[in-house]
A protein has these predicted regions:
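Cap/lid segment of the alpha/beta-hydrolase catalytic domain
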Residues: 35, 84-93, 195-206, 286-295, ...
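Short beta-strand element of the alpha/beta-hydrolase
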Residues: 274-283
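Active-site-adjacent alpha-helix of alpha/beta-hydrolase-fold enzymes
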Residues: 102, 109, 113, 153-181, ...
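Primarily recognizes the serine-hydrolase "nucleophile elbow" in alpha/beta-hydrolase
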Residues: 41-93, 133, 229, 362-363
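Alpha/beta-hydrolase active-site loop
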Residues: 28-39, 121-127, 134, 215-218, ...
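C-terminal motif of bacterial Sec signal peptides marking the signal peptidase cleavage site
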Residues: 22-23
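The feature captures the conserved acid-bearing segment of alpha/beta-hydrolase catalytic domains
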Residues: 81-175, 220, 265-271
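N-terminal cap/lid segment of alpha/beta-hydrolase-fold proteins
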Residues: 109-131, 224-272, 341
Length: 363
């Protein structure tokens, strides 16, 4: 127990440094276009993410379950895991600090299991309460979803037990066992896995893309969508850099979003409306500001998109003094509504889906 306390204390010091950091990399300015209006079918949207992106994928799924039919959680845990018991009593940054402490110690390292963190049963009850209050979509819409979960055997950042807790959380909500796939036998580090790009399989380092001879993009898309056409040899569509600011509106400065996001548009989706949308959330230190287009172009999503009429949205978060690693908000740095459909990041990404659904402006 003493060693656990020592680790927790070290993590708290790390958190204090994170929250008081004064500098971050300057965002580069680049030419951007408007998000193309493609007449997309957003009622069969799927989401995926790694690390903080995994938590955001789960949060977006819960908030907009009527639109989302599947979620892929890579090196992430259950929805609401980081929320402190003091969330309703300590205002502002104090709650975010407590949430972040819980996030690292209880939702990544799994050091708080003896204190009931992360309890899938309790988290499912809290999710049901949020749904009853109308803060997220009805749980009944989640129970029809297809779920993919992944933990690499060489991942020392997020404990395998945390990912298993996520699988248990979905089961507690009522998602059938047949709809849940947990992959835990690949020696990957803390990274997105491919069969032809990235670092050596066991590495956990930028750009957090590794080659394990496993096509994770294809695996998770098949789990969520079912049978797909074989992927293309090379991607032939367009990676469009678009301005994210209109989707955050007046909350842009506090949303944590980067100015520029990316959407991959297959040629078939420019020519004919009705393409489905997959939203891929990057992990911490995996945004374009940090690793360029490595995750976007090396993950393999585009090759599957080309042959299956699938638009892939890559929204982006920026590094900042309160979020120096450019993580998605899964502990409340954007405010207390971070788990609800009113969360700045969730609301902005949902507006991006609305923009893709619009017609008459295909570019």
């Amino acid at each position: 127990m003493t060693s656990l306390i020592r680790i927790a204390a070290r993590n708290l010091l790390f958190l204090a440094v994170m929250l008081t950091a004064t500098g971050c990399r300057e965002a580069s300015h680049e030419a951007t276009a408007a998000l193309p209006a493609l007449g997309a079918n957003i009622n069969e949207t799927t989401v995926s993410g790694i690390s903080s992106g995994a938590y955001m994928a789960g949060q977006f799924q819960m908030a907009h379950a009527k639109r989302v039919i599947g979620a892929a959680i890579i090196a992430g845990g259950p929805y609401g895991c980081s929320e402190s018991v003091f969330a309703d009593t300590i205002p502002g940054a104090g709650t975010a600090f407590l949430n972040l402490s819980k996030a690292v110690n209880g939702c990544m390292l799994d050091l708080l299991e003896s204190w009931g963190v992360a309890d899938p049963t309790e988290l499912a009850k809290k999710a049901e309460a949020r749904a009853a209050k109308g803060e997220i979509d009805p749980i009944a819409d989640v129970t029809r979803d297809r779920i993919y979960l992944f933990t690499g055997t060489s991942d020392r950042t997020v404990a395998p037990s945390i990912v298993r807790h996520a699988a248990e959380f979905y089961a507690k909500l009522g998602v059938p066992a047949a709809n849940i796939e947990l992959v835990s036998n690949i020696p990957a580090g803390h990274a997105f896995v491919t069969d032809d790009n990235g670092n050596a399989c066991e590495i956990s380092a930028e750009p957090y893309v590794v080659d394990c001879n496993y096509d994770q993009a294809g695996a998770l898309l098949k789990q969520m969508y079912g049978t797909l056409q074989p992927r293309a040899e090379t991607a032939t569509g367009d990676f469009v850099n678009f301005d994210q600011r209109p989707f955050a509106g007046s909350e842009m400065s506090s949303s944590g979003l980067a100015e520029t996001g990316v959407v991959y548009v297959p040629k078939a989706c420019r020519e004919t409306p009705g393409c489905r949308v997959h939203v891929a959330f990057h992990g911490c230190a995996q945004n374009r500001e940090t690793v360029g287009d490595a995750f976007i172009k090396e993950s393999g999503f585009a090759r599957w998109a080309d042959t299956n009429r699938l638009i892939v949205l890559f929204p982006q978060v920026a590094a900042s003094p309160i979020n120096p690693q450019g993580c998605w908000d899964w502990w409340g740095y954007t405010g207390p509504e971070y788990l609800t459909r009113n969360a700045p990041q969730i609301a902005a990404v949902n507006r991006m889906l609305d923009g893709l659904q619009a017609s008459g402006g295909r570019a």
